[in-house]
Amino acid sequence: MLANPATKYVPFAPFARDFSERTWPSRRITQPPIWMSTDLRDGNQSLIEPMSVERKLRFFEQLVKIGFKEIEVGFPSASQTDFDFVRKLVDEKRIPDDVTIIVLTQSREDLISRTVEAAAGAKQAIVHLYNACAPAFRKVVFNMSKDEIKQIAISGTQWVKQYMAQHPETQWRYEYSPEVFSTTEPEFALEVSNAVADVWQPTPECKMVLNLPATIEATTPNLYADQIEWMHKNLARRDSIVLSVHPHNDRGTAVAAAEFAVMAGADRIEGCLFGSGERTGNVDLVTLALNLYTQGVHPGLDFSDIDEVRRCAEYCNQLPVHPRHPYAGDLVFTAFSGSHQDAIKKGFAQQKPDAVWEVPYLPIDPADLGRSYDAVIRVNSQSGKGGVSYLLEQEHGLVLPRRLQIEFSRAIQRVTDETGREVTADDVHTIFNREYLEQHSPWKLVRHRIDGDPAGGQGKQFSIQVELDYNGERRVVTGSGDGAISAFVAALGIPVRIMDYHEHAIGTGTDTRAASYVELRVGDSATGFGVGIDRDIVTASFQAVLSAVNRHLANGVTVTESETAQAA
């Protein structure tokens, strides 16, 4: 890179003075633009291996299913494959009556004739003619004057009218693009556009499409919006023109440029699904449409099965959609960060059906796009208690008390730090089982018998007889207390203090099980949790006590021989 890039690059300034008449910044988008997909033309021509007719047909059908009413289907004068594909659509009557196909051509008579021939017979079609108008193209590519460039556009428009007239069975419309509008002097772009409209003679009932492409994205999006608003206000036949934009993504701001352009007066947007197209791609129509959706404006396009749309695009383009791609990527609804997971978990818990969507970190409900919530929270070394507990609750119905969430997250953290990898929901459950439910040494519950009501009652004493396995040795102990758990602890004969207790049901009906969570202290040790799960709530609570005691002992808490002997 140069130490001083100003010696090689200069900023593009579309206006000699500041365009202070702008009004677009205060506007809002309250209805969708006309959408035109150019996946089968601009998207296709940018592929290493252009689509076969079979792949183009599959993509076309997907675009129709999504709801596109204008689809650019090819460049038939430049490719026999494109010509054959357009004819297949027309001859086999594959174009719905409410869909208009668009065919692109350069401004040469033989190419225009071939283009019209390709689309002739369709119920409705648009011929899209373009020629470059920017200074660099006039000087470097064509070595032509402004008048010569303008004449190319005028002549091309005249030829289009001539050849369309030979096929009255089709309802024809016309689209003109001053290519590289983004770096063309606004006054010259206006001059050429008005000259083309003078030849075409559009009316409010039969409008011409004037497309203003950011063929090369050369400025910040606000300057592109200024250019669009200036054209919008100065076109001679504005009421007879559909003002269209075609932003490319060279600077990475095509979506913003398109949104600003609509605010500035554009009626129509051309682009591709997932931003396919030359170089860095065209504007992404999926992102644009779903940005509108998240603002309460239905885009008129259906992405309720976003994964199907993505699979189709990946197959037809032979290119993957990035896992972080807005709305459609594998990871866009996934949180690894602990604080994010905690906020999402709380948001899901508070979100009411049919209420305004207010789940933190998720700008859209994944279910609206056909996504499940399974991958919303995933666990790695950056995760915290919220994500871990969410997975256990969603996948296994375990609702952990807050302090247990914190304690168990440390066990997960140890695993992720040691392995450096993500742990799945199944991994989390396996670690939970190992940490809490498989702690059977040295104490394991065999059976018990209680004299009294396990539900308890004020002032009521319970007697219990418990059979335990202590390191393979069977022992029978007895105890009493004012509740089942206190009687069980008394029978153990170990200095245990119950600090907290939680329980809940897992499942419903005949498959219901009880989950018990006990926080206790052995002697003067720190507190720790144990967990028990059983069809019987009392059995589950006893298992939870033994789970906690065994975990304490495994972590180095000692119990004297006399204390252990009391349980003999």
UniProtKB/Swiss-Prot annotation:
InterPro entries: 2-isopropylmalate_synth_dimer (IPR013709), AIPM/Hcit_synth_CS (IPR002034), Aldolase_TIM (IPR013785), IPM_Synthase (IPR005668), LeuA-like_post-cat (IPR054692), LeuA_allosteric_dom_sf (IPR036230), LeuA_N_DRE-TIM (IPR039371), PYR_CT (IPR000891). Residues 439-568 are annotated as: Regulatory domain. Mg(2+) binds at D42, H246, H248, N282. GO terms for biological process: L-leucine biosynthetic process. Gene3D superfamilies: 3.30.160.270, Aldolase class I (3.20.20.70). It is an enzyme of class 2 (transferase). Residues 33-307 form the Pyruvate carboxyltransferase domain. Its cofactor is Mg(2+). Its main location: cytoplasm. It is found in: Cytoplasm. Its EC number is 2.3.3.13. One of its GO terms (cellular component) is cytoplasm. Signal peptide: none annotated. One of its GO terms (molecular function) is 2-isopropylmalate synthase activity. Pathway: Amino-acid biosynthesis; L-leucine biosynthesis; L-leucine from 3-methyl-2-oxobutanoate: step 1/4. Belongs to the alpha-IPM synthase/homocitrate synthase family. LeuA type 2 subfamily. Homodimer. This is 2-isopropylmalate synthase.
